[in-house]
């Protein structure tokens, strides 16, 4: 299957400004199920310099800097991806990990090696805000994978999905109480739910091709949970499913703010306005 992605971002300033160093998280992160057949990238105004860099989480991004003043920053990316289908459930879970958490009276999972690397992906403080809800889902589930499937489907069915163009993400407890949220809000809420039972999770932003998604979802957000034996497994509460070849990640991080496509600053007293658009088209099945 071939798909084309066109991503346009425009920051407009009501006065001229001097742009600071920018990080553009608009580099598709490697996955074995897709191949980039074509790519084109344009930045206006012209950069003084740019280079590919990699952050602590392993994400590649484009760092760029400017010397001329401007009243706008325009970024356009175009890609053609060849996608190879795969089974998102094609893994064998570490049974000892599953059984130790599933049989735990407190419903808590624990990784055999709780290394420093895992800490950012786990819950920072002991809270049980979602535990009553999670316990109910557990009663209806036959194991850990089935639990995650049911939880993801329940969020999809019981929380209203909204399109919000603001860059902020609602607090998980607020999203839970409001019974609604954007793809980013729902992803963070499920992240925090899974962290509450000891699972490591990270936030993912990227492109999603799915006819069932409403307009505005092409620049999408989902989460990944680390399951021993399976590794990082993608989950999308906006559609109630495990992610497949239709998901192309741009960045993943335990902190959602670190996955914003454009990160940078400017010098000046101007106010800015953001307009962004993403088009995803099927070229060939």
Residue ranges and their predicted role:
Residues 3-4, 24-29, 97, 152-158, ...:
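Short acidic/polar alpha-helix capping motifs at helix-coil junctions
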Residues 153, 185-272:
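Hydrophobic/aromatic-rich core segments of domains that either
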Residues 1-102:
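Intrinsically disordered, low-complexity N-terminal segments that are enriched in acidic
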Residues 14-25, 162-172, 220-224:
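Short N-terminal helix-initiation segments at or just after the protein's N-terminus
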Residues 25-27, 42-44, 78, 224, ...:
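Residues in well-ordered beta-strands of folded domains
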Residues 8, 12, 133, 171-175, ...:
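Short, hydrophobic/aromatic alpha-helical segments in well-folded domains
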Residues 100-102, 108-181, 189, 213, ...:
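Secondary-structure boundary elements
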């Amino acid at each position: 299957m071939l798909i084309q992605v066109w991503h346009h971002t425009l920051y407009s300033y009501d006065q001229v400004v001097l742009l600071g160093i920018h990080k553009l998280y608009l580099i598709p992160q490697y996955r074995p199920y897709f191949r980039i057949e074509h790519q084109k990238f344009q930045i206006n105004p012209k950069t003084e310099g740019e280079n590919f860099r990699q952050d602590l989480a392993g994400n590649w991004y484009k760092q760029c800097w400017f010397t001329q003043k401007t009243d706008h920053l325009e970024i356009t990316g175009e890609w053609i991806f060849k996608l190879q289908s795969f089974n998102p459930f094609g893994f064998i879970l570490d049974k000892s990990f599953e059984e130790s958490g599933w049989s735990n009276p407190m419903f808590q999972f624990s990784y055999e090696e709780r290394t420093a690397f895992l800490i950012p992906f786990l819950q920072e403080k002991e809270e049980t805000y979602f535990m009553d809800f999670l316990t109910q889902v557990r009663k209806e589930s036959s194991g850990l994978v089935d639990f995650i499937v049911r939880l993801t489907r329940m969020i999809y069915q019981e929380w209203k999905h909204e399109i919000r163009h603001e860059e902020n993400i609602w607090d998980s407890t607020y999203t839970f109480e409001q019974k609604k949220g954007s793809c980013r809000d729902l992803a963070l809420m499920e992240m925090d739910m899974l962290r509450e039972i000891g699972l490591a999770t990270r936030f993912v932003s990227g492109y999603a091709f799915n006819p069932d998604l409403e307009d505005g979802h092409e620049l999408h957000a989902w989460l990944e949970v680390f399951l021993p034996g399976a590794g990082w497994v993608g989950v999308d509460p906006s559609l109630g499913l495990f992610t497949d070849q239709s998901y192309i990640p741009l960045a993943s991080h335990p902190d959602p703010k670190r996955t914003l496509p454009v990160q940078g600053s400017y010098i000046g007293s101007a106010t800015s306005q953001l307009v962004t658009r993403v088009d995803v088209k099927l070229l060939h099945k």
